[in-house]
Amino acid sequence: MKASRFFVSTLKDAPADAEVVSHQLMMRAGLIKKLGAGIYSYMPMGLRVLRKIEAIVREEMNRAGAVELTMPVVQPAELWQETGRFDKMGPELLRIQDRHGRDFVVQPTSEEVITDIARQELRSYKQLPKNFYQIQTKFRDERRPRFGLMRGREFIMKDAYSFDRDPAAAKASYLVMEQAYRRIFDRFGLTYRAVAADSGAIGGDLSEEFQVVAATGEDAIVYCPQSDYAANMEKAEALAPSGVRGAATRALNKTSTPDKSTCAEVAQWLGVPLQSTVKSLVMATDEAQAADGSVKSQVWLLLLRGDHDMNQVKVAKLPGLGQGLRFATLDEIEAHFGCQPGYLGPIGLQKPLKIVADRDVALMADWICGANEAHWHLTGVNWGRDLPEPDMVADLRNVVAGDRSPDGKGVLAIERGIEVGHVFYLGTKYSRAMNASFLDENGKPQPLEMGCYGIGITRLPAAAIEQNHDARGIIWPDAIAPFTAVICPIGMERSAAVQAAADKLYADFLAAGIDVLLDDRGERPGAMFADWELIGVPHRVVISERGLKEDQLEYQHRRDQSATKVAAADILAHVKGRMTV
């Protein structure tokens, strides 16, 4: 491709609403153009990146035995009503009506449609296993779209769905796809981690996220440097605390803590470690009663160490806490504690409630908590002496760096990441809801076992940039760069020798299968170099009249700080030697 025929459009400054580096650089490099909140056009330079990502994904999906199809973006609401997701999903699900008043949704995912296809087509065990995938536009009506392609409303995803006869076969399919994902992200040239994850709204009991490591990532990735353990923050666990509870050494005492309503403030006021304080979090559950349709609410008190944060995903999986979990209202708190938040504790309750203690709190002695009276706390609190043992002891918290790894092989570390892929074993959640079954060898109907596998095609360029950039611009890995190499002839319009050398090198690169662009726009060297450094083309060759007189060209990898002189006859081999694809 020659630059004069291509579309190159760069900006000196990023738009004011571009918050993160990837958004700023994609706008400045002319990869995307904003149309509306969370909606972007993929410009020619950006589309080349997407097409390379899609090509790698297709190759590896096909290699893994998946078969491509395409499903509609607009889907009948009836399918979503079968699974209950039409009502359960919030305003992120875009609901529309046609001219006849019929309800439809704009797909954020395609579980319902693929399950509908499967129940019509996969009638016999002889047709299994099957794995279908698509690369398709999706829409999620984000309340606050931001960060460019990182959290847009319209986006492109690769989603795949496997169908098997039993859990063992389904888990085998899951492992095939998990390995395919590792090959995909290895080929992208990105640093990533596959981490255990919660399945969330899609459901299932086996799930992994693929996270691109980046300091600006939205997600916390937990891993153990001494082992293979890795999980996202929702799923991560620490090794259960060992030992026995210490003996009580202090008397229960009510202490004035004027205007000190947080554990940190109380610890500082009393001159004690934050770890000796206990925070009280009041939750409630709402359970619909089948008999009359009324809602039964129950209030729960969760106790965590003052330096720990609640993990709501873990809490929602506890017995009795899974139905309609929410934070209690101020009225509910007042009724049970006789006090407003900031000074709450488990002693002296106005009304009884269930108390759930985190594993660490259950082993504490002489701890500090609210006195259920404004501006007062209790010190020297001890289980058994000052209050009954908790109704339940469980893991309620997010892990912190330095916790012991649950596999016992070291301590946990935390880094930031950007989720770009997710694999789920769904089981029969959707097949049972939609009556998708096959006949086994005995002619008996059995529900299809399903898996679900997604990759954020349009999120990947943003994640790659967050991981690979510098002050000059983007640094693309070879495999997904818009162009692998760029030839920059200086004074091409004035020098027949430069033009001839540029044309020959361009032809040589094309013949060698290198995705090359020849910059024949006639720009000044400084402007030309700045454009390609901003756009992030990995390999740059500069041809000048002075260099040709010495039979040399200049080569510079995008990560290099300076150029290297290379003999003209050796330049092709030199570039190929630096390439990683």
Curated annotation (Swiss-Prot):
Protein's UniProt keywords contain rRNA processing: no
Gene3D superfamilies reported in the protein's UniProt record: Anticodon-binding domain (3.40.50.800), Bira Bifunctional Protein, Domain 2 (3.30.930.10), YbaK/aminoacyl-tRNA synthetase-associated domain (3.90.960.10)
Catalytic activity annotation: tRNA(Pro) + L-proline + ATP = L-prolyl-tRNA(Pro) + AMP + diphosphate
Keyword Nucleotide-binding: yes
GO MF entries: aminoacyl-tRNA deacylase activity; ATP binding; proline-tRNA ligase activity
Subunit structure comment from the entry: Homodimer.
Function field: Catalyzes the attachment of proline to tRNA(Pro) in a two-step reaction: proline is first activated by ATP to form Pro-AMP and then transferred to the acceptor end of tRNA(Pro). As ProRS can inadvertently accommodate and process non-cognate amino acids such as alanine and cysteine, to avoid such errors it has two additional distinct editing activities against alanine. One activity is designated as 'pretransfer' editing and involves the tRNA(Pro)-independent hydrolysis of activated Ala-AMP.
HAMAP family: Pro_tRNA_synth_type1
Descriptive protein name: Proline--tRNA ligase
Species of provenance: Verminephrobacter eiseniae (strain EF01-2)
Gene: proS
